[in-house]
């Protein structure tokens, strides 16, 4: 772990405990894991308390008013305005991507991403870059030709 990796504070939001545990095991050697949550209300409270640099955010999370990840993002801005959000979801539907990007997520990757690519994506959004999973990027490139 280098010094830049250690200083990046990460929070993980996903309603599947086993998935969160796997992500934490993958990221813990590289980053400071400061919190985790499984629903809208718990996520907003955790983000307000821990003020992470980056939140890995599932799109479909129970609770709140039914807005899932987009709702968490919008409600958390007031408490942690400098936090960057990277959506990490099993879904790659345009509706899901659009909802969190419109809400302010810096990127969107699918859960098929490798551990190394996830680490790289976190560093990139932390540095201010937008990140999208290779499948979404390829679809955009093809659509513009």
Question: Residue ranges of each PLM-predicted region?
Answer:
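Conserved active-site segment of CheY-like receiver
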Residues: 15, 88-92, 111-113
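Non-catalytic signal-transmission and effector/linker regions of two-component phosphorelay proteins
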Residues: 1-9
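Acidic, metal-coordinating helix/loop segments flanking the phosphotransfer/catalytic sites
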Residues: 38-54
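Short, flexible helix-to-coil linker/hinge segments that flank and couple to helix-turn-helix
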Residues: 95-102, 107-144
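Active-site residues of response regulator receiver
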Residues: 58-60, 89
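Two-component signal transduction core modules
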Residues: 36, 55, 85, 108-109
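Two-component/phosphorelay signaling modules centered on CheY-like receiver
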Residues: 17-35
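Short amphipathic alpha-helix used as the core "switch/output" element in two-component signaling
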Residues: 67-82
């Amino acid at each position: 772990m280098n010094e830049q990796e250690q200083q990046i504070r990460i929070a993980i939001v996903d309603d599947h405990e086993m998935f969160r545990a796997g992500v934490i095991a993958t990221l813990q050697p590289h980053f400071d894991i400061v919190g985790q949550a499984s629903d809208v209300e718990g996520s907003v409270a955790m983000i307000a308390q821990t003020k992470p640099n980056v939140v890995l955010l599932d799109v479909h999370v129970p609770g709140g008013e039914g807005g899932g990840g987009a709702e968490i993002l919008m409600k958390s801005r007031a408490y942690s305005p400098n936090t960057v959000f990277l959506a990490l979801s099993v879904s790659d539907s345009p509706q899901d991507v659009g909802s969190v990007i419109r809400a302010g997520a810096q990127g969107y990757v699918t859960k098929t991403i490798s551990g190394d690519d996830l680490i790289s994506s976190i560093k990139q959004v932390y540095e201010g870059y937008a990140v999208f999973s290779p499948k979404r990027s390829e679809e955009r490139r093809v659509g513009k030709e």
